[in-house]
Amino acid sequence: MLMWGCAVAIAVYVGAAISGAHYNPSVTIAMAVWNRFPWKRVVPYILSQLVGAFGAALTLWIMFRGFAAPFEAANKIVRGEFGSQLSGMVFATYIPNPAAVGMTPLAYAQVPLYVGFMSEFIGTMFLVLMIFVLIEERNDLKPHITFFPVALGVVVIAIVSITAPLSMTSLNGARDLGPRFLAYLLGWGQMAFPGPRGEFWIPTVAPILGGIFAGFVYNKIVLPLYPKKSAEPIVAAESKPSVSA
């Protein structure tokens, strides 16, 4: 969990001054819907996010591929068949977490798909809501820009600690969809698309809707409650100290 927070913080430090650290379609779309980001940049940004996620997954696969076959052999996993989500989860998210909750009928009964949808919707809602809060000029408690990535990382750690068993905490359609496509190409087949329960769409759609709803909560409920910044007092010309020649 700490790793996720650190990864997010580092990524924001690297990309904030270049692209605003838009690594997540849920954030990009929510910002555009609520007039915080130009629509003309949405599609290029999302394509970049997908390509970046695919490239990152491919890089990690090249580095760690030697561990995949022994793990699958030891656990009697046949890639592409049911049960191979236990190895495919390094790429894609599943409902529920195959390693933490399981892949049995009981596990699926404990975590129905609607619960996984709620997990992603609510988790992303809080993520995007906190982003709005952390960048709000009227928020006197917002962190200095230097510490914004750290604050965001802490938010991610908190969300992961709650939602990881339920939906593996996607929060980001690009983070799931890009690596999921790679998993499909590498032989996970139907365990990638459509997924063992047909749930491939949830880690993308639920976060987008959750992000948009976060914008609604922020702009319609939270923002009006902030105290308005008072105007700077106007100093009359005659009250200004004169300068001697």
Model-derived features with residue positions:
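Membrane-interface helix-loop junctions and terminal tails of multi-pass membrane proteins
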Residues: 1-245
